């Protein structure tokens, strides 16, 4: 790709406001995204710990954390879109070029994210009554956490 082509990819209207506004909003929304990811990972780890415990207290915590983890994944996905859009506004031609060069990773992370989310729901469906019966299918929760961590590694590396 030549420099002339990169300049041609630039938006002719330019950035809609001062770039600092978009950089600050990008950092703010990324911080919110990371907070949701931390809630998701922490709730997932507590779910794994509590679901297979003999203690009723841990199982009750696991039931609550499973619901929290499920919701936190959705919140993390929604909050993860905004920083990407702010990056796209500020670094438009470079964003396009990097996505073309790493297209398989960009497309692959969406598929891995979907499979990780499905694995979380499979664990949820198998464990409607964790408190009484204990956890079942822990491999699904482990797979979900591993796949969601892989998504984070792909996107943020």
Annotate each predicted stretch with a short phrase:
Residues 72-141, 155-156:
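Membrane-interface helix-loop-helix modules in multi-pass inner-membrane proteins
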Residues 1-30, 57-61, 85-104, 157:
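Membrane-interface interhelical loops and short amphipathic "cap" helices
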Residues 35-45, 112-116:
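Hydrophobic alpha-helical transmembrane segments
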Residues 29-37, 66-70, 106-109:
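Alpha-helical transmembrane segments of integral membrane proteins
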Residues 37, 44, 70-73, 77:
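Residues within membrane-spanning alpha-helices of integral membrane proteins
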Residues 41-62:
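Membrane-interface helix-loop junction between the first two transmembrane segments
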Residues 147-157:
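Long hydrophobic alpha-helical segments that form multi-pass transmembrane helix bundles
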Residues 26-27, 59-73, 128-148:
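Alpha-helical transmembrane segments and their helix-start/interface "positive-inside/aromatic belt" motifs
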């Amino acid at each position: 790709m030549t420099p002339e082509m990169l300049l041609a990819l630039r938006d002719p209207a330019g950035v809609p406001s001062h770039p600092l506004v978009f950089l600050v909003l990008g950092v703010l929304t990324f911080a919110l995204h990371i907070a949701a990811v931390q809630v998701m990972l922490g709730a997932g780890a507590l779910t794994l710990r509590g679901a297979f415990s003999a203690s009723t207290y841990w199982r009750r915590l696991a039931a609550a954390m499973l619901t929290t983890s499920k919701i936190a994944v959705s919140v993390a996905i929604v909050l993860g879109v905004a920083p990407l859009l702010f990056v796209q506004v500020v670094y438009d031609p470079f964003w396009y070029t990097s996505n073309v060069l790493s297209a398989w990773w960009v497309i692959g992370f969406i598929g891995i994210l979907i499979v990780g989310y499905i694995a979380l729901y499979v664990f949820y469906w198998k464990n409607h009554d964790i408190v009484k019966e204990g956890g079942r299918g822990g491999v699904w929760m482990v797979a979900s956490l591993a796949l969601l961590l892989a998504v984070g590694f792909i996107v943020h590396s």
